[in-house]
């Protein structure tokens, strides 16, 4: 919208003194990088300050900063809290074979007392594929990820909030707009890239006085990544048991 107004001559940017790019990683994930670059180029030559905020620092962010920012200062803020996970959240962690994960998820979704559930995938492709697989198995499921248009994402979020679907498959960045207190289960279909993302994921359940369950499925090729998270957060589960869709423990 900003670009359209500027190109029509209805918006003058020559007096802009401060430009703030918030949720920069989300902009990249949702495909807004070309639009952001166009706005930055429109300000090129103007004396202004640029501030860029990002929960994570993906690869394309750094070249963007180098191109459009002069001698940028990188400030990293960390939480001083030591209790990273809610005591009201029961954590269940186990290793699962990649080819068996969909069946394991389907089994877990039939748990007694399960309500609204968010399933986290690390990639847009995995999120889309899992949502399709669960829908074919008869579950009422929505999806939010960067390959979907804004209207499709908003439609899925609305359906989840209003109870039209009780399962939402999401990537980490696309899930930031979700604000639902009564999520009973969070399922980590894929292990996240870092400990804080894990904390943010499971923090979606066990909120506002409710109890919750956080299930983490560690793929055999994800064990090293999980052990980093386990050590950083002192979870005490460096080598989770191996479970299958037919396991009685599940």
Residue ranges and their predicted role:
Residues 1-250:
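Conserved helicase RecA-like core
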């Amino acid at each position: 919208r900003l670009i359209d107004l500027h190109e029509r001559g209805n918006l003058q940017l020559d007096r802009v003194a401060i430009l703030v790019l918030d949720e920069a990683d989300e902009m990249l994930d949702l495909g807004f990088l070309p639009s952001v670059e166009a706005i930055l180029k429109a300000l090129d030559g103007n004396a202004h300050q640029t501030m860029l905020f990002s929960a994570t620092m993906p690869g394309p962010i750094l070249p963007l900063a180098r191109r459009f920012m002069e001698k940028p200062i990188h400030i990293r803020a960390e939480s001083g809290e030591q209790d990273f996970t809610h005591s009201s959240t029961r954590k269940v962690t186990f290793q699962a074979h990649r080819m068996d994960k969909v069946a394991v998820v389907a089994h877990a979704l039939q748990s007694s007392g399960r309500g609204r559930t968010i399933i986290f995938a690390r990639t847009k492709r995995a999120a889309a594929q899992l949502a399709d697989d669960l829908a074919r198995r008869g579950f009422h499921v929505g999806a939010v990820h960067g390959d979907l248009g804004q209207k499709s994402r908003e439609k899925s979020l609305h359906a989840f909030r209003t109870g039209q679907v009780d399962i939402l498959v999401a990537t980490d960045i696309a899930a930031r707009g979700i604000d639902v207190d009564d999520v009973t289960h969070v399922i980590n279909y894929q292990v996240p890239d870092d400990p804080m993302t894990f904390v943010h994921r499971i923090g979606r359940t066990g909120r506002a006085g409710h109890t919750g369950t956080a299930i983490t499925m560690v793929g055999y090729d994800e064990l090293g990544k999980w052990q980093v998270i386990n050590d950083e957060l002192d979870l005490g589960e460096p080598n989770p048991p191996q479970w299958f869709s037919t396991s009685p423990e599940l």
